[in-house]
């Protein structure tokens, strides 16, 4: 058994970690890294060619951390270059642009690509040996925001990922993200390479998360309640009661649950007005 003295000795050793960035082109991956490491913002877009590699040292929880950062190009053209860099990673920064819905919807594809490269033995829904931080970037942008905070937070937290609202341009949220990100990686390393159970507990169920997403994306009141057009009053009320119990804000802590609950109430009211 490892002695307490040995653990203290190991905790004083510099910790070496590998971090990668993932996300579509032009979402701000490189800018986020430069803002944190170099304290500057590069306004002119410069596409990452393949992989950008950098090393930085940080102090977290009285530990010196040597971070090897692999900033991966987001363009599909560079898949053959970046596919070699997924292995032996302790941390992943997933970035999307809040003004580009497609960049948010592509996050699942990025996780699938990572799973493919790590092998079939990896369960992407239970990656407890890697810390993920999701950056909802460009919150300073003047263009219309397509992905609101509750939607991004729900997607992230339902997978046990950290979630942050960031702006590489203004610096908002950047330091907080990296501090929490690195701190979680230190906890992972100190826990034998697995995230502590407390860090994975999300506080809401997959059924709740899936219901909120379905309600958010529904095309009409029928679809929102999950009933077919022409359903009876009893069928509408039954569907409503099930969702109301599942998503009531007093019982559900999932991001977006309050808005989803209100939408369900309004959908029921609208449908019952037209049913005799």
UniProtKB/Swiss-Prot annotation:
GO molecular function annotation: GTP binding; GTPase activity
Localization per record: Nucleus
Pfam families, per the entry: DnaJ, Ras
Principal location listed in the UniProt entry: nucleus
UniProt superkingdom: Eukaryota
Domain J intervals: 220-276
Keyword Kinase part of the UniProt annotation: no
InterPro entries: DnaJ_domain, J_dom_sf, P-loop_NTPase, Small_GTP-bd, Small_GTPase
Record keywords: GTP-binding, Nucleotide-binding, Nucleus
One Gene Ontology CC term in the entry: nucleus
Keyword Nucleus listed: yes
NCBIfam families cross-referenced by the UniProt entry: small_GTP
Known role: GTPase possibly involved in regulation of the MEK/ERK pathway.
Protein name: DnaJ homolog subfamily C member 27-B
The organism of origin for this protein: Xenopus laevis
